[in-house]
Amino acid sequence: MRRIENTAQFKRDYKRERKGLHRTTLDTELIPILNALASDEPLESRHRDHALTGDWKDHRDCHVKPDLVLIYRKPDEAVLQLVRLGSHSELGL
């Protein structure tokens, strides 16, 4: 299982989402995704996990909810780095 690292921006994004629209379901939706990513298990197709391009070329994103996106990367075999969390417009996607 990979060790999970949170960037400072992810921590701010998570705190914002915990107070916002997704406050009641954020943890119940996010924790199973994080467990699957940390264990290198495939995500369900509804999460639309895919690689990003351009400035985000070494990152991937998946949909926690239809307009709640998790950007992450796996820099090596032991680490899962959580980079951003937010809507498409907040993240500039």
Task: List the predicted regions and their residue ranges.
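Basic, Lys/Arg-enriched alpha-helical interface segments
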Residues: 1-66, 75-81, 90-93
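Acidic, metal-associated active-site segment
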Residues: 72
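Residues forming the ATP-binding cleft of Hanks-type serine/threonine protein kinase domains
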Residues: 86
